[in-house]
Amino acid sequence: MSVLDAIRYAVDELHANYDDPVWRRKRLADRVVRPVHARWHGTNGLDIPAADWDVLVVLDGCRADLFEAGALDAGSGLDGADGGEWGDHGSVPSGPDPFDAYRRVTARGSATPEWLSGNFAEGAFGDTVYVSANPYVARVCGDAFHEVRAVWESAFDADVGTVRPEAVAAAARAADDAYPDKRLIIHFMQTHYPFLGHPNLQFAGIDADQVLGERDAVAGEPHDPWEALALGRIDRRRLRRAYADNLVAVLPDALSLASELRGRAVVTADHGNLLGERAWPVPAKLYGHPVGVRTPALVEVPWAVVDGERRPVRDDGVAALDPADEAAVDERLRRLGYRE
């Protein structure tokens, strides 16, 4: 494309979308924030395969501050009269702090495919079995592991549009029984939306015929709760509460696995989410988890350790993943709200 053609394209695109605030934010993130952050921050972050763990429990899209409020000190930050910063909840885990150590670490991505690519796309991990509710594992690095257990295929709940935590926990225990000599990665879909218990926050702005949720013809219609917040369709407190409820939903299963499975377990996240924070160098508010945005709310994630008897680990080589049904993967990603 020539420079003149590029200018014409930009002008036409601006003319067609100038009144769509969602489009403007996306273009700012893609064309300004992302290149600047790539230049200044790169994709530096914790090398997951090289880190010290036997069992890695991944909470998809869980901000560090949300995790700290809900999982540390028995979830006291989600309880109480005013519910603290993240809303009023009465079903958080009780008891003492379940972790032996805790810190924040920097993730190698601000969205799941970026995190997967940054950690696993270039390697072979024959000592690891990946149990995942997130279909991106098949698309990005499905052949990198000894086995991938695709819970998004076997236990997708069409009524809620996601994989429930208990299905992932059951698959993880089965993998543990089958592979006592392998590292385990257990990737829950929560805290990523859809928000369990909040069907009115599904936002069906995605047509069933669209692939990976390409945009509607109607400008400014929200496709997900983050866009709905950006457009003023829901208030910040309501979204934060639903987001926190997803942590409440997944935490019992995540903590049970971390404490029960043999080995040094770590509970972490692949990325966080923005709820209107501003990302340098532009003053515009951003929402959700745009790729390549290296702001703390997105790339600072929890790293909570549960020490246990170490797991004997043996590398038996990687296995080729059965060719994923691309249409099925696309549909699962669409139902989970992903858009490319």
Could you describe each region identified by the protein language model?
Residues M1-E340:
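Catalytic domains that recognize anionic headgroups
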